[in-house]
Amino acid sequence: MVETLESIISFIVVFGALVFFHELGHLLLAKRAGILCREFAIGFGPKVFSFKKNETVYTIRLLPLGGFVRMAGEDPETIELKRGQVVGLLLDESGQVEKIVLNHKDDYPNIRVVEVEEADLEHGMYVTGYTDGERFERFTVKEPAFFVVDRQEIQIAPYHRQFAAKTLGQRTMTILAGPLANFLLSLVVFIIIGLLQGYPVDKPVIGELTPEGAARAAGLKQGDKVIAINGERMETWTEIVNTIRAHPGEPLQFQIERNGKERSVTVTPEAKTVQGETIGLIGVYQPMEKSVLGSIKQGLVETYYWTREIVTGLGQLITGQFQLDMLSGPVGIAVSTGKVAESGIYYLMKWGAILSINLGIVNLLPLPALDGGRLLFFAIEAVRGKPVDRQKEGMVHFIGFALLMLLMLVVTWNDIQKFFL
């Protein structure tokens, strides 16, 4: 029970952080482009916690399965004023409309009640209508202005503040920023690990020793420089490993340098069978170093390596070399995260960085409802010279989202069978 709880907490913290930075990428680029962002949400479903800062409501929702940035023009519930509709207008000192009250008008003693004749809240920013039943007036709507519905304020978004109004480049960068934020996060985490823990180097030096390994028993110490093994000169850590692995159970003569003096040590590798192959092991780890430039280089190497590995895995999945039941969903990832967390904070950080790369790559796939799907429609727009009809695009994304949810259910059921049944 305790282990299950720890797995759940580890998963929520790690996955929540990945989603946070992914959505933060979208948010920052959207705001930079001048898009009105109504909500920044981590999770789906009912709100657990929320606060508003400037134009945006920041929320944490119940189900930690993703997140979203709700941008103006992408709202499912757009408010429109219709002819004959009776609304209340709250005016500022200059006579411009600050708030359009749709109900509970009695809450406002200084309200101007208007029967709407015409309203343009995207371009012209005005409302015309009749006051006192017969007097026709035109009211200018200021920026920012708000609808008030059930005593809740909703900011009115002129067209120039909407997602669709922005250039193709601005929209592309806003969508691309999410996956890019995941790659950047992974790079930063790998660099931090290098700065705190160190990074492996391919030098002929003994690293940390295991308590009961053959190396410690023979008298080797951390920091010993290996000059030669059985008379063969060693230039790298890789050469040392290959030599030890190739001689299970056979005494090896190590020529080492310690404190400026050379000495000879005999070590007999323990024979161990791994995946059907018998290899030699002496219980030593690769040497580690710490430096800013080295950590940055290692971070770039790790980010590239895991990006390549994940892309290769996806290619094998598409070509049928991997089966669907080999995929892991939220349950499988949560279980794996819990196991990794038991190994220590650095292992958990590295696991989180790998998951972040995974999230970035998956979101770049040209599938409906994913960032890659949006980017595909932008590419079509660039070729055609005009955007795809919004309703048609929305339907494609809706169907794609439904299929993704179906896939999620299948993968989750596989996880439950694998780990709990």
From Swiss-Prot:
Task: Give the chief site where it resides.
Answer: membrane
- Positions of the PDZ domain: 186-271
Q: Where is this protein found?
A: Cell membrane
- Keywords on this record? Cell membrane, Hydrolase, Membrane, Metal-binding, Metalloprotease, Protease, Transmembrane, Transmembrane helix, Zinc
Q: Which cofactor does it need?
A: Zn(2+)
Q: What is its EC number?
A: 3.4.24.-
Q: Which InterPro entries match?
A: PDZ, PDZ_sf, Pept_M50_Zn, Peptidase_M50
* Described function: Is responsible for Site-2 cleavage of the RsiW anti-sigma factor. This results, after a third proteolytic step catalyzed by the ClpXP protease, in the release of SigW and the transcription activation of the genes under the control of the sigma-W factor.
Q: What is this protein called?
A: Zinc metalloprotease RasP
